[in-house]
């Protein structure tokens, strides 16, 4: 069968081998190919930037740093489906590459004769050029696997760096590493062993970027606190905000105050309810709906406008009534959806969304009651003595980390069934949208400690690492793997990849990953991860309960 594209970066890739005609996500082949060209341009920019850094050139690298992070983010699964949006990024990166090339030349820097550096193109040439720079350009399966594992980790890292940047938090070391890593996977000079080391180094920078984002979020909005979140609806029109960007959340709440419009979170924005600064807004009503993949039904019943601040977009059905009510911003895009630009100071005008909301009916109730969350590291460590006592007394036998992503595949019911089957002396630690598989189950508590502790968004997996390291210290252990903590993680896209690599860099072993192992892991690379880190897939609920809860 003719390959019109090749992409295998997400968990739902066709046949767990790769999408070759159209993305399972809904992305058409021309847009997918154009993303390959965009990433290729970023590699060229990274080679130039790394060469200049190594030569000690003093220059303003900010423009290039932002271009790399924002464009990597735009290629994450379900972030941007808009060919024209990606084409604009390709055009800008060609121009930036030429500008940097000229700067390097004037500084007397000899750049590598790599096609990623030298390639230039016009819009009418993009589709042709894109066909020559895709993933399969690397013919060695194992080398390709290690390179793509690094790149997908960098995409997740870039997403977190971009969120932190929007709050004014930037780490130049993270930017420089991202560029060096792109340089290294492109130049083709590293052995398989060196590429494996680069994968783990990417994980260590994943820890750094999650720490940076945690600092940005908590210093700006306060430490998340235990919160009961309303999952019902009010009597006023609403705006539904999805994604991960807390800066957009803040601006939307500011601009809707006093307008008669309520604001609801959806999907990964649920943890915004846990931050003290947002609680002062009386019109911040609660959370509507569940994980990202249910949006086709939930957006219909919400009745009001929807704002995507980041992934995950699901292409609407042709007859969807909500298509004209969806807005995108930042790295996101979809043909026909309106895009909200930011000004030179990062501010956005949401007046069009607010005006539309005023013409809409209130949300239709799809559930009622409350759910509890807000168990990030600051909150949990404030009751560390209670937690350690519960472990020491045997009241808590195991903590089960079930962070990660949710998805559409029917096999993901496994995670609901696994949570239900866990013994009553176990506690689930979660973050990311995987939580929606079990955060509404009535699993009770252990001595006042809820059996599902939600730390927040996928990046708040950092909180779970902080908690684990603190418990290791308090319990006097010399190895993080001696803690009564096991890992059964669901993955979907590239932010889950950087979380996994971060855990590996911290020395965590025996992580179970599902519902399938990534297609981009070649048999040999998978073997290395299995032998060195104990990485495993999932089996049946009964088998995995026996394996993990000994």
From Swiss-Prot:
Its main location: cytoplasm. GO terms for biological process: response to hydrogen peroxide. It catalyses: A + NH4(+) + H2O = hydroxylamine + AH2 + H(+). Hybrid [4Fe-2O-2S] cluster binds at residues 244, 268, 312, 405, 433, 458, 493, 495. Keywords: 4Fe-4S, Cytoplasm, Iron, Iron-sulfur, Metal-binding, Oxidoreductase. InterPro entries: HCP/CODH, Hydroxylam_reduct, Prismane-like_a/b-sand, Prismane-like_sf, Prismane_a-bundle. The modification Cysteine persulfide is found at residue 405. Its cofactor is [4Fe-4S] cluster; hybrid [4Fe-2O-2S] cluster. CDD domains: HCP. One of its GO terms (cellular component) is cytoplasm. GO terms for molecular function: 4 iron, 4 sulfur cluster binding; hydroxylamine reductase activity; metal ion binding; peroxidase activity. Binds 1 [4Fe-4S] cluster. Binds 1 hybrid [4Fe-2O-2S] cluster. [4Fe-4S] cluster binds at residues 7, 10, 19, 25. It is found in: Cytoplasm. Its EC number is 1.7.99.1. NCBIfam families: hybrid_clust, PRK05290.1. PANTHER family: HYDROXYLAMINE REDUCTASE. Catalyzes the reduction of hydroxylamine to form NH(3) and H(2)O. Belongs to the HCP family. This is Hydroxylamine reductase. It comes from Porphyromonas gingivalis (strain ATCC BAA-308 / W83). The lineage of its organism: Bacteria, Pseudomonadati, Bacteroidota, Bacteroidia, Bacteroidales.
């Amino acid at each position: 069968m003719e390959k019109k594209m090749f992409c295998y970066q997400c968990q739902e890739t066709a046949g767990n081998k790769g999408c070759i005609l159209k993305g399972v996500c809904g992305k058409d082949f021309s847009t997918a190919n154009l993303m390959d060209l965009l990433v290729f341009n970023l590699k060229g920019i990274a080679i130039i930037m790394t060469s200049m850094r190594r030569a000690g050139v003093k220059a303003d690298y900010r423009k290039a740093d932002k271009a790399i992070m924002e464009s990597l983010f735009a290629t994450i699964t379900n972030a941007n489906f808009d060919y024209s949006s990606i084409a604009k990024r390709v055009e800008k990166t060609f121009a930036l590459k030429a500008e940097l090339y000229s700067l390097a030349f004037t500084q007397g820097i000899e750049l590598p004769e790599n096609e990623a550096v030298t390639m230039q193109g016009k819009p009418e040439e993009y589709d042709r050029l894109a066909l020559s720079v895709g993933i399969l350009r690397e013919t060695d399966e194992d080398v390709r696997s290690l390179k793509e594992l690094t790149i997908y980790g960098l995409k997740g890292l870039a997403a977190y760096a971009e969120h932190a940047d929007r709050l004014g938090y930037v780490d130049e070391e993270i930017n420089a590493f991202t560029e060096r890593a792109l340089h290294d996977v492109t130049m083709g000079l590293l052995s398989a062993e060196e590429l494996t080391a680069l994968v783990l180094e990417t994980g260590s920078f994943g820890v750094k970027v999650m720490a940076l984002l945690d600092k940005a979020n908590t210093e700006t909005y306060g430490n998340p606190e235990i919160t009961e979140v309303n999952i019902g609806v009010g009597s006023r029109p609403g705006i539904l905000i999805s994604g991960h960007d807390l800066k957009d959340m803040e601006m939307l709440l500011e601009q809707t105050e006093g307008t008669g419009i309520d604001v609801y979170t959806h999907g990964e924005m649920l943890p915004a309810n846990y931050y003290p600064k947002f609680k002062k807004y009386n019109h911040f009503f609660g959370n509507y709906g569940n994980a990202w993949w249910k949006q086709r039904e939930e957006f219909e019943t919400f009745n009001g406008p929807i704002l995507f601040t980041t992934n995950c977009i699901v292409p609407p059905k042709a007859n969807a009534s909500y298509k004209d009510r969806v807005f995108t911003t930042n790295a996101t895009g979809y043909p026909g959806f309106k895009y909200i630009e930011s000004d030179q100071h990062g501010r956005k005008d949401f007046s069009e969304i607010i005006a539309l909301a005023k013409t809409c009916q209130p949300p239709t109730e799809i559930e009622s009651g409350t759910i509890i969350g807000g168990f990030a590291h600051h909150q949990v460590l404030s009751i560390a003595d209670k937690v350690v006592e519960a472990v020491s007394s045997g009241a808590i036998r195991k903590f089960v980390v079930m962070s990660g992503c949710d998805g559409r595949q029917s096999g993901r019911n496994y995670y609901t069934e696994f949570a239900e089957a866990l013994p009553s002396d176990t506690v689930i630690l979660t973050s990311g949208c995987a939580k929606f598989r079990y955060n509404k189950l009535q699993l009770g508590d252990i001595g006042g400690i809820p059996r599902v502790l939600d730390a927040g968004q996928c990046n708040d997996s950092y909180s779970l690492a902080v908690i684990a390291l603190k418990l290791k210290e308090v319990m006097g252990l010399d190895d993080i793997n001696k803690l009564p903590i096991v890992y059964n993680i669901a993955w979907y896209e590239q932010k889950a990849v950087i979380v996994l690599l971060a855990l590996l860099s911290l020395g965590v072993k025996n992580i179970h990953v599902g519902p399938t192992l990534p297609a981009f892991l070649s048999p040999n690379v998978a073997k290395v991860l299995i032998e060195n880190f104990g990485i495993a897939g999932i089996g049946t609920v009964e088998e995995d309960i026996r394996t993990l809860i000994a």
